[in-house]
Amino acid sequence: MSPKRIAKRRSPPADAIPKSKKVKVSHRSHSTEPGLVLTLGQGDVGQLGLGENVMERKKPALVSIPEDVVQAEAGGMHTVCLSKSGQVYSFGCNDEGALGRDTSVEGSEMVPGKVELQEKVVQVSAGDSHTAALTDDGRVFLWGSFRDNNGVIGLLEPMKKSMVPVQVQLDVPVVKVASGNDHLVMLTADGDLYTLGCGEQGQLGRVPELFANRGGRQGLERLLVPKCVMLKSRGSRGHVRFQDAFCGAYFTFAISHEGHVYGFGLSNYHQLGTPGTESCFIPQNLTSFKNSTKSWVGFSGGQHHTVCMDSEGKAYSLGRAEYGRLGLGEGAEEKSIPTLISRLPAVSSVACGASVGYAVTKDGRVFAWGMGTNYQLGTGQDEDAWSPVEMMGKQLENRVVLSVSSGGQHTVLLVKDKEQS
């Protein structure tokens, strides 16, 4: 064997790996269609991005961002937008660093501002007080903090929040990021799930109940250092690999390569589709989603409810029913299995806020239901809607809706002008 071959076997230091070696990641969840950002609801900490004088909007309002946007995500009290060129803009509450940028100038958190990242970003996710950005070569940057019932637990290090982006140390490329209120799920190119953040309700899928409160004897590192969710696969060696993952506020859904739906975390209103209401600390293969004719393609979870969709464009809901958040009509009660929301046209995506639900239809309209208190439904009223209501407004005229995302008290839409025929 020539010495040249032997030399090649040694792995070079990470910083010596040439840029061209880096793999470009892709996943069906990456958005590429550019549009305009609209916000509505309550915005007293700037999460609407409409400046210091606008505290609420009962109808969608246009946010001024200097570039076309391909993804717009609502966190608990902040909003994150990804531009077509791979830049990240943020606005809203920055107390814990969720904006990832300096907002010392008064009012600068109330309007979109750019996050300093040298990398091209292909996907963002946002929680209550954290934000994640996935780069085109599969690295994840994170900023803000995670909290549990007792307050801040830190971000990547115990008790330390970060006001600027920091890279998550993982030696495998990530293809998708998803955020719950206080946890982050990363899906790798190999189909592994890495989780970090708060684990109190089981939402990390890898921390036993005994250690879920602040990590037990190992401390917060157990929660904040990303680790893989290991689940033995039946009948074969190795472990279950996943093709997709989604988060609710305190829970996680993951779809395996075989198409099975797994869930872990809070299910106190059956929002995971479990027969019981105990939290699940390890992934459960959810029998309520087993139906040979359906393949599940999208999930979104609020505080206590879930809205999901199948490959035929039908939307379903389960979990807590108060305030109409299931969209199943007046007087609907709690559901422990996915229940068809019958009054909707064919759907292309679904989303949940804390106590609201949304569906974007294949023809580019958006329907909303649930709690009306924060004006998140776009009806102009603060009454609850027990059935889906089509969202209307001046900014929606002659436009198609590309996506919707919803936080604690505000909602963000991505829209584009209808093509003139």
Swiss-Prot record:
Annotated positions of the N,N-dimethylserine modification: S2
Per-repeat ranges for RCC1: 34-84, 85-136, 138-189, 191-257, 258-311, 312-362, 363-416
Region Disordered, residue ranges: 1-36
Reported effect, K4Q: Abolishes N-terminal methylation
Main localisation: nucleus
Record-linked PROSITE patterns: RCC1_1 (PS00625), RCC1_2 (PS00626), RCC1_3 (PS50012)
GO MF term list: chromatin binding; guanyl-nucleotide exchange factor activity; histone binding; nucleosomal DNA binding; nucleosome binding; protein heterodimerization activity; small GTPase binding; sulfate binding
Effect of substituting R9A: Decreases KPNA4 binding. Strongly decreases KPNA4 binding
UniProt modified residues of type N-methylserine: S2
Other remarks on this protein: Patients with Raynaud disease produce antibodies that bind to RCC1.
Protein name: Regulator of chromosome condensation
Top-level taxonomy: Eukaryota, Metazoa, Chordata, Craniata, Vertebrata
